[in-house]
Regions:
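Transmembrane beta-barrel outer-membrane domains
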Residues: 1, 41-49, 61, 96-102, ...
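Outer-membrane beta-barrel proteins
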Residues: 1, 13, 22-30, 74-83, ...
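Outer-membrane beta-barrel signature, preferentially recognizing the C-terminal barrel domain
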Residues: 1-4, 98, 158-202
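Transmembrane beta-barrel wall of Gram-negative outer-membrane proteins
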Residues: 1-19, 60-66
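Residues on the lipid-exposed face of transmembrane beta-strands in outer-membrane beta-barrel proteins
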Residues: 2-6, 52-58, 105-111, 139-143, ...
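Membrane-embedded beta-barrel scaffold of Gram-negative outer-membrane proteins
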Residues: 10-28, 144-146, 150-154, 181-202
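Outer-membrane beta-barrel transmembrane domain signature of Gram-negative proteins
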Residues: 19-23, 28, 32-120
């Protein structure tokens, strides 16, 4: 991963670029007797990802903070299952080799009308392949109940949208090319606090 940061008094920008490699193995064997295992599944998955991301923050006084972020990923995935048995009872290799571009962009505005209260709104949109998600909004609120112990009340409501990954669609075994995106809403609320002694433990 390569990263770059640039800071000023009331704004900052940052960028990252990198490469991620993942390898998965899935084996399934059946005991056919006498301690002998017959492998029914012998699946291997190679996942290569190139990515770049950038983000920026801009403060207006002490009450407003605006942030923007964009992420671009290029995925290359290869999957093989060498234990598939065809109708003529011969083993054959089944799998897939696909690539997909994914883009995510978001903007956030945070307002602190008082020292204790913070309110923020986020708008996000994503692209996967040639498809675009609907606009995904989220709202967050937090209130500092007590400075002692940093006791905060937090709440949020957001729209959720999840599209299938390449492995969700094509992984052998278990991939399902008929999967469709999932959507919904989530609501959260709670209290957070911190214990410890500054400079000693937390």
């Amino acid at each position: 991963v390569l990263s770059w940061d640039h800071l000023r008094r009331n704004w900052k920008v940052a960028a990252k670029a990198g490469y991620i490699y993942s390898w998965f193995a899935y084996d399934y064997a059946n005991d056919v007797g006498n301690g002998k295992l017959e492998y029914m599944t012998n699946s291997r998955n190679w996942y290569h990802t190139l990515f770049v991301s950038g983000e920026g923050e801009y403060y207006i006084g002490r009450k407003w903070l605006f942030t923007a972020q964009a992420d671009l990923h290029q995925h290359f995935v290869t999957n093989n299952d060498r234990r598939i048995i065809s109708q003529d009872m011969n083993r054959k290799t089944v799998g897939y080799d696909h690539a997909r571009t994914e883009l995510s962009a978001s903007i956030t505005a945070k307002w602190m009308p008082t020292e204790r209260l913070g309110l923020s709104v986020t708008l996000r949109e994503e692209m996967y392949g040639a498809q675009w998600t609907p606009l995904i909004p989220a709202f967050y609120a937090d209130y500092l109940i007590s400075k002692r112990g940093t006791i905060r009340a937090k709440a949020s409501v957001s729209r959720n949208y999840r599209y299938p990954t390449l492995n969700d669609l094509y992984f052998q075994p278990g991939g399902n090319t008929d999967l469709v995106p999932e959507s919904g809403f989530s609501y959260d609320g709670g209290i957070s606090f911190a214990i410890g002694k500054e400079g000693v433990y937390s």
